[in-house]
Amino acid sequence: MHVSRVHARSTLALVATGALAAATALAPTSAALAKKEVSAVRHIVYQQWDSASDFAAGTASGTTVVGDTLRIGTPSGQFSYTDPFGAGTTATYDVGSWTSPVVTTGFPYTELVSSWNAKTPPGTWVQMSVRGLADNGSTSKDYILGRWAEGTESIHRTSVPVQGDDLASVAIDTLVAKKGRSLSTWQLTVSLYRLAGSSSTPTVSLVGAMASGLPDVKKVNASPLGGAEGIELAVPPYSQEIHRGHYPEFNNGGEAWCSPTSTAMVLGYWQQQFPGQGYGPAPADYADLIPPDQWVDYAAANTYDWNYDGTGNWPFNTAYAGRYGLEGFVTRLRSLTEAEQFIKAGIPLVVSVSFKQNELTGAGYGTNGHLMVIRGFTPSGDVIANDPASHLDPNDASVRVVYNRAEFENVWIPKSGGIAYVIHPESVSLPPNVPGAEPNW
């Protein structure tokens, strides 16, 4: 099981500099191992539905399509829910749902992360679930991957604990097969809820998922240059360290806010690229929050997972971006070569990394789970990052940093499996998928 499942992913953890021996132990010990690293296939596939024609391919129950969004039509039933983080009262909701076609991956997969973009007026919320064909030929149960609402007027957004069985479990936001088990298909269901008798409705504009079957390797070779050398995107730098102690009810404040800080940086970038399009919160939304960079505090409050007790739920972050008309989803990339294609297209990435203090030169810290923004590449192919940890210095000026390409690839690809948030306006096209590779965006 990959380090991506360590759910202290959004908290920095200093590592003693004497950990050199442990780092050395990760290095290849033979030519055979090095060859294995080069040849190991990284199976990743992503698929989404985001248009009227896409949604027509699925099965609707109590939902209808207006424009390119799903919404509740004539409800198919009702559901009673007691918010475990609310006042303890039970509310009854009208329900509609949409179920995707069955997706066959073509390989045995062991992890799946879903994505959705939805707007949820007060009194409404959505739930994502998945089922699939197990390696023994049986169909799995439905696993709940998240209950989402923009604010807390409806429910407190949350992952759902204690869903494990002999096939798989849900690790916060990720379906994870048990050791020695796998699945070969997946099928998503998004359920839409509104208070019974209300005429309001959530609207869902994107439903998708990434499934992966990855080799168990500890080190990868640096990937070939991908053509983005010398390109740097103007992503604004925000330091999570500035927010130490802010709103400790949200996972003890800014020290743990790497994910929403990174997401806020990408939203800030798109706001600068397209002024007036509303690709982020308005000043009135965060006017009462603690300065500076109050939009970071706002992002933290609005990505917070009440079960996980943290702001590092991956699809909650991309769903937050989706509130503002951006398209956001979670996938895995196979290499920095693939990441370069996004930079060439003008799209920064948020990526999940993990490393000991001496494994990423210039970071100045170690972490068992962290997120940062890839904003470009130097002429020689090293990574230009906006690292919200900012060398543990509470200063936005310390956020931009250049990291060695080979080192960066090895704290990203083998550790989180190459997790990336892809956030972009519909008007900015994604780059083409790599020819001959399974489509992972």
Q: Which residues does each PLM region occupy?
A:
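Secretory targeting and sorting signals
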Residues: 1-34
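Active-site-adjacent structural segments surrounding the nucleophilic cysteine of cysteine proteases
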Residues: 191-310, 438-441
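Residue-level detector of short, conserved catalytic/binding motifs and their immediate flanks
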Residues: 110-112, 116, 126-128, 186-188, ...
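Noncatalytic regulatory segments and standalone regulatory/sensor domains
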Residues: 38, 43-49, 53-87, 91, ...
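Conserved active-site-adjacent core of cysteine acyl-enzyme catalytic domains
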Residues: 91, 100, 284-440
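A short beta-strand element within beta-rich, extracytoplasmic domains
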Residues: 107-120, 355
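Short, surface-exposed tryptophan/glycine-enriched loops
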Residues: 159-183, 341
